[in-house]
Amino acid sequence: MRRLGFACVVAVLMYTLAPIRAQSVYPTGTTIYEPARAWNGYTVLSPLQTQAVLVIDMNGNVVKRWEGLNNSAGGPARVLPGGILISASGARPPNQESLELVQQDFDGKVIWQFSHNEQIKTGEGSTIWSARQHHDWQRESLPAGYYSPESAPVVEGTSTLILTHTNRMQPKVADVMLEDDRLVEVSWKGELLWEWVASDHIDELGFAPDARKAIKAAQSFNKARGSFDWLHINSAHYVGPNRWFDQGDMRFAPNNVIISSREASLLAIVGRDGKIVWRLGPDFSESKELRSIRQIIGQHHAHIIPKGLPGAGNLLVFDNGGSSGYGFASPIAPDGVGAFARSTSRVVEINPVTLELVWSYTNPRFFSTNISSAQRLPNGNTLITAGAGGRMFEVTTEGAIVWEYMYPLFGGANASNAVYRGYRIPYGWIPQITRPTERAVAPPALGDFRVP
């Protein structure tokens, strides 16, 4: 890994001295809406502090709400055609994981559930089955997890890819108990079809000696959990049908899985034989192409844009910023953990074969230190969830904001309105609801905005 010297010091100053641009009073709900330029539909929200999944229309009205679900540990909720919901349920604090993945119909009737992954001890000492699911899951027929004109989501009888935890010792990684990341693919009946455990493949992940040393030291061991969340994989998607595979590049086989490791600043594709067949990061100084992309830090929601959408076949990533990565000791990372830092976020679209940076969105005031997502829409716009602040917005390829929404419900000890992810779906996917009227929202000029 290249020693960045002065650049690292600049990063430290930017991160530690950057002003916090968070006003105490601001409007919530839909604050900008241009119906003619937006891709109109319902938006599915996975709020962290609300034990429910919400669906809103373009004007921010709640049109559907499923209660008793746990977005804070299990991650994204998704709605499939017919008003079918799949979401996590049940928490296991202090572990960031859910007890089960549940599929419900529009009225809340359970159609499918998965929990038989591992047996765990509850706080009361009893033993129960748990999915140990965290951060992500995918249905085989909806590889990127969201709508495309060429997608045909299968509601029942299909397999599911689930990102889970498993605790294990692996001396090649560290000399403490790992909270390891394990991918499982299960049938509709809950049978294990395929699995992959991250720590078995540490030698394939591109870590330099300094990074391996920092990981081995395990300074981020979580005493409350009794384990070391060394990679913190936060997304796992099927690659899905794509032009690269059509042209003969087997790395992009549709049933391969693309993963994102927040802690390592690493993205990789896992082949069905378990081997890493493609990798981006962790060190973005390794080549001219990577230096052009620039270091990705603390990223979320890495996936291949599905066929049928503008940019199909390219990689789309919410690059959070904050700090992440393992490497050499520095003022910001005396133990080599969190070696890279940046105080702004960006969304990047990358050609995964040439590593060309195709498109990006950023702004000096755009920053979500964790969670968050980006979805490519059929009209070429991108729906961005800056999750830490509960903000969702739709931007054109030129960066114009044509829809913006601030989640209005606050909860938890920190009075947070954070939203893990948001997804835009067609109106027709929830036929039980009458299509709403779309009303433009033109915000006042900031200089004219006053609280009475």
What would you call each of these model-derived segments?
Residues 5-19:
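Bacterial N-terminal signal peptides
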Residues 1-2:
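N-terminal secretory signal peptides that target proteins for export/translocation
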Residues 22-452:
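Histidine-/acidic-rich catalytic cores in large beta-rich domains
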